[in-house]
């Protein structure tokens, strides 16, 4: 810091004999005027000129204090006459008010027009908004006052050492904070809003302070407090201070007092130096707003104005830059990665040096060595910098230059250089012939670094840390100002006092280049050929061979790393991007592609990389071209370079390589010209055909052979196909003889006529193409054409598959008849076709014809299981009956007793599910199509069956209870309800309530069934209980029921004697009985106790044919003979399932459903195999098998 005296003056008394004390000073906010409180007047000075402008009179006694408002419209004065006078901007008194005692100090609010005035025993607040002065008595004398920076709080220092802090809105309120101190009076208070002030908490951790208050007293103490009254720290002064003021936005602190010296401190109270030495006590000090100008007043009337100049202390090493901050801090930046670190030294920083990871800082009485510990490695470079104190050299060395290396500190004092280690031990010294003007570290191994220095006699020397003898590199005429050496230590650049920069070869001493008017020069740290230098506001970046880039309006260049220069502009080091386009083009023009690549790697734009790549490719510099194309990620050109390198390794001449490059860059005619000039007409022809330039290829094709012309036709066909002209492409392929490719193209474009035409031309040995054509004809439904092709290649299997896939069953059956080996290929898909349409009997016969018995059984079993699980019990009964027939058929061929038992089991399940379906509908649906009597009979039938899957006994007994109760069978209803009490009723059926109601109601009914509801046995003629069983309880004769109404039919089973065959028995029954035995009944005359009725030949011959029903079953099941006891009741028999029915019920069921209600056999049953020739949408060429043909 260097103070410059601007002007000095002295205020004398009225007799101009002795000076008067200057009690207070105040700058106008715009800095143009300075107020002085001296004697009983207010003096105005012109700050710029230093002359007295005006003297204001209005006070009758000494004026102690003056203050300007924040906007410069008002200023105030007060003094021993107890008056406060307000003056306007024209220096006219506008208002005055008084206190009860001497006015000691005053200050305007920094944000509004509120004035704080302090007398000895009171203080008050005045504002332009409220003309009344709000006053508050003070027990202790008021000595000083100050507002904080935002005007919300004001502080008053008292004579007993206490400080009171109050809110700026009301003076009458009690102090919000009272700071108790020693008994010494507080003569100065100042606030600073600098947020970088740091204190420490109770645990020793640093904490930030928003705003601080500095306080001075005559106990020779400078103290700091926060706004909440917390003590921060204190500093001891060697004098009695009287005035204090912050300057430069709170960065520094000015204090004056009894030692007659105005001193400058840091914001933390660290002494930095002296501003001025006066002859008497310094009583007041103030700082000009927004400037570095300081005014001070002394007891003897002296007024002086100084301008503070802060010199720049800095150093640079490659991309790292360190500079002094706030006089006591070192701020280190890595300008390349934009990271930084602030080092607090708590002392005045005099000099510093930076090298690699080391930083040396000279303080007042010591030198501190720091080591970079954060942001060093490649992975941490983008993280925050961190420096740690490594060593301290506690010596007060005097020197002009200082540099640091890995393990040493080198200082220079005039002609002498001294080397110290980090412990302060002197290791080596060098004595030069003249004063050393410039010193820097070039680098080198640790503890063996190289220094370069310049002297005032023009000598440039190189010094090694471990060598006692300096080496002369160059001699200039005048003193050396700046030196640098390139990266490979071959070229030296030096600037002398005449500002002439010379570049010379270190080995030979030859001058390579000279430039006048240079202020600084630096070589690039990566590329030894690049350097930068500055002239008059110009930055030049060039090489020794050619001029380069020039930028206007920069300072001094201090560093040059990769594509960035670091220039010092005033006090800031600014990184500037260097465009290398000019240098790149210069190297390319000279044909030096390797150096051009090195320049490009420092940083050029994408277009420059492309230009370098293309030029290197033209020059057949494939390595450079590959690296350049890789930078722009041009994969196409990278592949081309790879192919060119491969061609070159295979011995291809340069002419072919250049022609290939021209072809890749779409210069086809130039490439073809090179091909023809070098005797490669074939390559020229391939080039033109690949690019579909057929007009140009004709010139090359004049002497071509037939095979070559065919190749041309193929190329044209390929081009036509790619150009979306497939028809032309097909014609070209036909002309060239590529019928297989032409056929594929015709098929892809769906040209049926061309496909028919080409099918006659294709060789029959080309099976693949013929099959593709036939597949195309099948898609177009041209089955005749496809069949003709298959026949021509003798592929009968494909014909069968074609008819099967198309559903042409008639044609498929005809082929299967002619060729038995294709029976399975025809009937197996046909069986699946029928099964998908629920034509299961026909599907089973088809499966049987195809020899797939297991698959037929699996399909039927799966359908049966699904029907039961889905509660489709009518279908379940039907499927179980079909399943029983299948088991029965298989038992005949395999003679397996297990299959016979399965057939019987399936038949019984069929009966049960058939009977359960109306019961299920009655319980689960609101309406039923069956009569209640029939449903009751079916439920009665189910009560005597064992437990079967999905047949609910709850539904069975609920049906009996409900219908029997309605029809007067109260006993049966009560029995059914009793059974329900032993069963669990599922809640989803919602039957619990109905069952409970019926149970209560049935108690009021008689425990009997009406006689009409009791089944009668047609053999003994006695009635049976409704729930008595499926056989008579008297004679044990089994009941035979009608499978529509489930009523008991008047049928009694009889058997024939063992020696009578079935055919004989049938013949006897069908014979005409004797006239005398028209009403013959075999039950008459039977003895009691006989259960089975066995008839001999005589009895059979007496039977009426219409009274006998014969049920025939496939072997090994025996036929059954049933006798109609009541011939007046006509009995119907289904020939499909052999079930017997009441004729009226059977006819009604068949009329309603169109088939037998049990086995679904239609009336027009036809067991013969036939084919329906009609083709319609629902039934196209589908053959029918037997009795189920109508129920698909």
UniProtKB/Swiss-Prot annotation:
Keywords tagged on the record: Cell projection, Chemotaxis, Cilium, Repeat, Transport, WD repeat
Main location: other
Disulfide bonds: none
Keyword Transport: yes
Biological process according to GO: chemotaxis; cilium assembly; intraciliary retrograde transport; non-motile cilium assembly; positive regulation of dauer larval development; protein localization to cilium; receptor localization to non-motile cilium; regulation of dauer larval development
Subcellular localization, as worded in the UniProt entry: Cell projection, Cilium
Domain of life: Eukaryota
An example Gene Ontology CC term for this record: non-motile cilium
Pfam families on file: Beta-prop_IFT122_1st, Beta-prop_IFT122_2nd, TPR_IFT122, Zn_ribbon_IFT122
WD repeat boundaries on the chain: 17-57, 58-97, 99-136, 138-176, 236-275, 277-320, 475-513
InterPro entries: Beta-prop_IFT122_1st (IPR056153), Beta-prop_IFT122_2nd (IPR056152), Ift122/121 (IPR039857), WD40/YVTN_repeat-like_dom_sf (IPR015943), WD40_repeat_dom_sf (IPR036322), WD40_rpt (IPR001680), Zn_ribbon_IFT122 (IPR056838)
Disruption of the gene: reported phenotype: Sterile. Defective chemotaxis with 86% of mutants exhibiting reduced tracking to the chemoattractant ammonium chloride.
Subunit structure as annotated in this protein's UniProt entry: Component of the IFT complex A (IFT-A) composed of at least che-11, daf-10, dyf-2, ift-139, ift-43 and ifta-1.
Function as written in the Swiss-Prot or TrEMBL entry: Component of the IFT complex A (IFT-A), a complex required for retrograde ciliary transport and entry into cilia of G protein-coupled receptors (GPCRs). Plays a role in chemotaxis and sensory perception. Required for entry into and exit from the dauer larval stage and this may be mediated by daf-12, daf-16 and daf-41. Controls the behavioral response, namely the avoidance response, and pathogen-responsive gene expression in the response to pathogenic bacteria such as E.coli and P.aeruginosa.
Name used for this protein in its record: Intraflagellar transport protein 122 homolog
Species in which this protein is naturally found: Caenorhabditis elegans
Gene name, Swiss-Prot/TrEMBL: daf-10
